[in-house]
């Protein structure tokens, strides 16, 4: 399997060329290319458009720079991450703007030769003052994801839904959210593919989000089975969404390996560990990345070993 890492905390720290060089030297085959960090939260929730996506040139200059660096160092684009949140309560302009950037991101994904994009479900992240019923949320997402089908078909891209969480911002308590129930997640994928008439939707399983909700990673993997086509691999302390390296938090990684073995997962081993990338001085980034790539190779060996070891 190909080993991949997200680029935030690497290319923005080292520069695009040096960042891709470091990714290659560490032993990675692919990158999880992030487009989610260029739309400021304050702009999103107030319905303001951002130049990066809407001036007609900045996004494409950035994508072209990344494409050239990736080609230079032999790095593939394993998946792209679209902007979020995809629903802003009481701000239809903000919701429309973000959903438009998702379509632009699908176009960018196709241009990069990448066949997968991760798009968060549309949901209200506030557990204290929820603005949607479960039925309203489900319909909202079916309509939203269905609207992406023409762009997905045009660019030959699979849209990956992701398991989410929400929080009571007053008490800091974390609650289940859209696609954190694996039966619901499977229902989304199956219904959307039926609407599309082909397999245009899959699932990106986020290990850290499972851990925040005390969900067993093995059970979730087996429940989704071959609907899982991408991964966000990271660890945490079980309380905060830290996005740290595997084995530095409390997730049971043997259960993770067992689950992927059981479903015969053959996709990319992708790390979403930006929470730790920026904690290291840039001089130590190469060493940290090498450890992470070695962890990916270890997972690959264990998942694909002839017998469990």
Model-derived segments and their meaning:
Residues 1-4, 9-27, 37, 99, ...:
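Histidine-acidic metal/acid-base catalytic patches
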Residues 1-6, 78-88, 124-129:
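N-terminal small/glycine-rich loop or linker at the start of catalytic domains
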Residues 32, 79, 118, 160, ...:
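Conserved beta-strand positions in the central sheet of alpha/beta enzyme cores
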Residues 71-72, 86-202, 209-212:
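Active-site acidic/histidine proton-transfer and metal-coordination neighborhood
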Residues 56-64, 139-145, 182, 289-293:
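Well-ordered, non-membrane alpha-helical segments in soluble/globular domains
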Residues 35-45, 85-87, 124-127, 166-168, ...:
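Conserved radical SAM core fold
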Residues 32-66:
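Glycine-rich, proline-tolerant flexible connector loops at the mouths of alpha/beta enzymes
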Residues 52, 56-72, 147-152, 220, ...:
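Catalytic-core regions built around general acid/base machinery
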């Amino acid at each position: 399997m190909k080993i991949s890492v997200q680029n935030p905390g690497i290319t923005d720290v080292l520069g695009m060329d040096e960042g891709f060089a470091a990714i290659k030297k560490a032993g990675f085959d692919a990158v999880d290319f992030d487009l989610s960090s260029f739309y400021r939260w304050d702009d999103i929730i107030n319905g303001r458009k951002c130049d990066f996506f809407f001036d007609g040139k900045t996004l494409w200059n950035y994508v072209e720079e990344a494409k050239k660096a990736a080609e230079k160092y032999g790095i593939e684009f394993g998946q792209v991450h679209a902007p979020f949140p995809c629903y802003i309560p009481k701000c239809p302009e903000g919701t429309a703007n973000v959903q438009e950037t998702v379509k632009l991101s699908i176009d960018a994904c196709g241009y990069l030769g990448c066949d997968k994009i991760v798009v968060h479900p549309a949901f209200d992240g506030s557990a204290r003052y929820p603005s949607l019923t479960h039925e309203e949320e489900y319909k909202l997402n079916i309509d939203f994801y269905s609207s992406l089908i023409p762009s997905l078909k045009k660019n030959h891209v699979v849209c990956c839904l992701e398991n989410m969480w929400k929080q009571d911002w007053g008490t800091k308590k974390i609650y289940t959210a859209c696609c954190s129930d694996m039966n619901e997640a499977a229902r989304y994928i199956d219904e959307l593919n039926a609407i599309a008439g082909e397999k245009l939707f899959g699932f990106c399983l986020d290990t850290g989000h499972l851990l925040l909700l005390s969900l067993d990673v093995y059970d979730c993997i087996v429940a989704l089975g071959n609907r899982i086509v991408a991964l966000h691999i990271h660890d945490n302390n079980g309380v905060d969404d830290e996005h740290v390296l595997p084995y530095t938090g409390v997730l049971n990684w043997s259960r993770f390996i067992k689950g992927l073995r059981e479903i015969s997962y053959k996709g990319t081993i992708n790390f979403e560990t930006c929470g730790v990338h920026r904690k290291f001085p840039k001089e130590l980034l190469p060493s940290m990345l090498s450890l992470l790539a070695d962890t990916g190779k270890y997972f690959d060996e264990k998942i694909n070993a002839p017998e469990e070891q």
